[in-house]
Each structure stands twice: as structure tokens, then as C-alpha cells.
């Protein structure tokens, strides 16, 4: 299996990504934000989804577009977070529906991190840049 990462996705420090041999790959869509120290294990994160810091997403899980898993949460194997919902806790459960403003922030977050990446790239000496 494989790990695929979409464009403008932000995977923060100490995040770990894995596949489950013979079962599931890890598929991360476009404009996804994954917080520090998250564990992304053989799951699917659809476009513009959000995983909080130190959250764990287990085998076969799906976080749909515009959905959020809160910081420190554990999403048990095979669970699906529907679009527009916030889940949190151990094990993770639905907390509430997200507001439209919160869902729109996911794209703003992706924009900010993409801009930071470009700013950082400008500061790297030319001889160290990859083509």
C-alpha cells in the first residue's frame, strides 16, 4: 500500500503516517491540516479536513471533507466523521456540527501554511533547493 498526500496539505512536526500492510493505504487530500504529533494510520483524510494536535486516526477511518477531529482524540478503527462535524475524545464521538465559518477556516489555514512554505523556500540558498 501507499501514502498519498494532496497539494497544499500541511503536516506538522512529529506527525507519523503509516499504512496497514495488505489492508489499507493512507490517503490525504488537498488543503488538509494535520496538527503536531498526530498519528495517521492507514486512513483517508478528504480535502479540507482537519486533524488536531496529538490526535490518532486508526485503520480504515475516513474524515470527510470539512470535518474535524479534535486535539488528543482517538478515532477508533473503521469510524467515519461526516462532513461538517467535530469529533473529540477517547474514543472520539460527535461533539457538534461545525459552523460555516469554522469550515471556511480550513481553507484559510491551508492558504496560510502554503504562504509560509513559499516564504521559507525563498530563504533557502539556491544550491540547497530541490528542483
Q: Where are the regions a protein language model picked out?
A:
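Sequence/structural signature of small/polar-enriched beta-strand/turn repeats
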Residues: 2-6, 25-30
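Glycine-rich hexapeptide-repeat left-handed beta-helix
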Residues: 13-20, 24-28, 36-131
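Short proline/glycine- and basic residue-enriched helix-capping loop/turn segments at helix->loop/beta transitions
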Residues: 33
Amino acid at each position: 500500500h501507499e501514502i498519498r498526500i494532496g497539494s497544499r496539505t500541511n503536516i506538522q512536526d512529529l506527525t507519523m503516517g503509516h499504512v496497514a500492510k495488505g489492508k489499507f493505504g493512507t490517503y490525504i487530500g488537498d488543503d488538509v491540516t494535520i496538527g503536531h504529533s498526530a498519528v495517521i494510520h492507514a486512513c483517508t483524510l478528504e480535502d479540507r479536513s482537519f486533524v488536531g494536535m496529538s490526535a490518532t486516526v486508526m485503520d480504515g477511518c475516513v474524515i470527510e471533507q470539512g470535518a474535524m477531529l479534535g486535539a488528543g482524540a482517538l478515532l477508533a478503527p473503521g469510524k467515519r466523521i461526516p462532513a461538517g462535524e467535530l469529533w473529540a475524545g477517547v474514543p472520539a464521538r460527535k461533539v457538534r456540527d461545525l459552523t460555516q465559518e469554522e469550515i471556511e477556516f480550513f481553507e484559510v489555514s491551508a492558504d496560510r501554511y502554503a504562504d509560509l512554505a513559499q516564504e521559507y523556500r525563498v530563504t533557502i540558498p539556491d544550491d540547497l533547493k530541490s528542483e
